[in-house]
Amino acid sequence: ELLLSSVEKICSAPRVVIKAGGGSRKFYRELRKFAQQAGAAVVLSPGSTGVLADNDPLNMHVGGSKGSISGNFAMQNADLLIVIGSRAVCQSDCSGVGYPNVKEVININGDLGDLTHYNQTIGLHGDIGAILRQLNNAFPNSAEYLLPKQAWLQACLHKKVEWKSFLTKIQSTEGVYDEVWGENVLTQPAAIKVVCDFAKKHEAIKFFDAGDVQANGFQTVEDDLPGETYTETGASYMGFSTCAIISNGMADNPKYGMALTGDGSFMMNPQALISAVEHGAKGMIIIFDNRRMAAISSLQQAQYGVDFRTNDSVAVDYAKLASAVSGVHAFTVDGGAVALHKTLDQAYLSDGLSVLHVRVYAGTDERAGLGAYGSWNVGNWCDSVQDIYLSRNI
């Protein structure tokens, strides 16, 4: 009865959005079929990239507190929400205010707490794959019900094109003058794009650390399958990606890994270099050094117009630091995108573990990041976000 009721609501709703969380990754085949039959735009969480191919017209990319132009558009304008294996957290639903026009929710989840998070919910509790297969079999044979949904899907597709155009513009920035470095250096979005393209070319797994690298990372990646990227957005443990490289030396079927980390996150656990060499890991750690906690700096700038105590005056030569560990191949990247490409090639050909030190820009130049498109219940935004939350239907 709940399955049939869910299908009826999906077929009759003109603007359906699916929030695909980390719990949907193992069931991406069922999800792709379900999205087609539901006529739904699909919004990803930071940890679920790849459940839809990057160029799939239904893939609106990430949506949440950081989000994207297309992902947050779909969240803000949908009237029916289908949650699949997702938790209601800031980077997923904008601290509870990400769906202002949604009237009803269908929640497919294995966790009862997540299943019942929203009001006005039909809860489908159990194995996500089994539930999706049953729903897929329950849709009408005729596709006439999809016709009224086309205007919605076209509007979402227009926003996807807008997002991709914006990414291309920001990621092609050659260099911005940085006061700390005293010269033009790559922006983080431009540098991360180069590394992600390299990883895709060599079918390497990407591991993203917490902070600014993480945020720019999940907005950048162009995954076509789950497992191409792992990003620790659940708790944002600094040092996660560096430690993850160790797994290459311990896995039965190792795959080349590339850890993308900031200077602060790397320093949380440089001991991982020793463990990686000890276990024979083969991979690469790319340190994007902006001499500060840039994620917090940008949040302070947005809320107060000034950053406070998020940087230091101590320069660290991370290539020298890493090269002190025997078995580590360390590189300093001097220059722009071409130099980064060249160094990535050299590091990839090295046997064992490689570490790249990449200096990147930090500051208020709008090209330094990929933007924030949602709400966040933090700092001096709390009162307004909570007022909105209490007024929501769901």
Segments predicted by a language model, with ranges:
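Conformationally flexible catalytic loops at phosphate/diphosphate-handling active centers
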Residues: E1-K9, G175-D178, W381
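Thiamine diphosphate
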Residues: S65, N72, N77, L115-T116, ...
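Active-site diphosphate/adenylate-binding microenvironment
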Residues: L157-D252
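Short glycine-rich anion-binding loops that position phosphate/pyrophosphate groups of nucleotides
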Residues: G22-S24, S48-T49, S86-V89, D111-G113, ...
